[in-house]
């Protein structure tokens, strides 16, 4: 079985459109085989975006979507917040789709290839992610701890994780090195915000 966090360029392409509306804004996302949630907007990602938009009161100027896939989180936030968003992913097909989706949705965003934070050179006010849980706990913690290391002063790391996939233990582990707050729960998913 192929994982969305790998890079199999030989996988047959079957391009498809995912149409989506939020806050009276319409979006179209190109998707394909070999990317995360290829047939529909993932519930956890949508829950993360909606929770952020309804509960966050701070203004963030530079935003990073790490492990962006075809760009749902970053593109949606860029459009609804009217902000530039940087996005990174390891999957070349996801990056190609994300570039198309930036153009289709006419947002101010960039996407580049990076194995987690390997090619990320800037620091950010907001880092937001639906991390690849299936890649294992070590990769998950690299996503989260690496994000904390790349936050500007007063910056925040927002992420979503399933209770069944260790939300409690991840929160506990992060609390050893930072403040980690549970923002919202829904259908077994937790949205958390961490800051130094």
Descriptions of predicted regions:
Residues 44-120, 126-129:
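Conserved SAM/SAH cofactor-binding pocket of Class I
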Residues 1-24, 34-38:
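N-terminal auxiliary segments of SAM/dcSAM-dependent transferases
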Residues 185-196:
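Core SAM-dependent methyltransferase catalytic element
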Residues 142-153:
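A short glycine-rich, Lys/Arg-flanked "PGG" loop and its adjoining helix->strand segment in the class I
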Residues 125-138:
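A short SAM/SAH-binding and catalytic strip from SAM-dependent methyltransferases
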Residues 178-182:
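A short linear hydrophobic-aromatic micro-motif
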Residues 154-162:
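Conserved beta-strand signature within the Rossmann-like core of class I S-adenosyl-L-methionine
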Residues 162-177:
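Conserved class I S-adenosyl-L-methionine
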């Amino acid at each position: 079985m192929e994982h969305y966090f790998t890079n199999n360029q030989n996988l047959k392409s079957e391009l498809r459109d995912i149409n989506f509306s939020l806050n009276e804004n319409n979006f179209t996302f190109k998707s394909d085989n070999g990317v995360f949630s290829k047939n529909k907007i993932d519930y956890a990602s949508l829950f993360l975006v909606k929770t952020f938009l309804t509960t966050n009161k701070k203004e963030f100027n530079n935003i990073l979507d790490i492990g962006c896939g075809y760009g749902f989180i970053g593109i949606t936030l860029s459009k609804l917040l009217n902000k530039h968003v940087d996005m990174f992913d390891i999957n070349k097909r996801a990056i190609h789709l994300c570039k198309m989706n930036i153009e289709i949705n006419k947002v101010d965003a960039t996407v580049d290839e990076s194995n987690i934070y390997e090619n990320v050179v800037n620091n950010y006010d907001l880092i937001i992610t639906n991390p690849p849980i299936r890649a294992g706990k070590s990769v998950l913690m690299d996503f989260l701890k690496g994000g904390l290391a790349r936050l500007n002063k007063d910056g925040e790391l927002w992420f979503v994780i399933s209770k069944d996939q260790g939300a409690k233990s991840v929160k506990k582990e992060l609390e050893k090195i930072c403040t980690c707050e549970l923002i919202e729960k829904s259908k077994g998913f937790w949205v958390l915000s961490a800051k130094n």
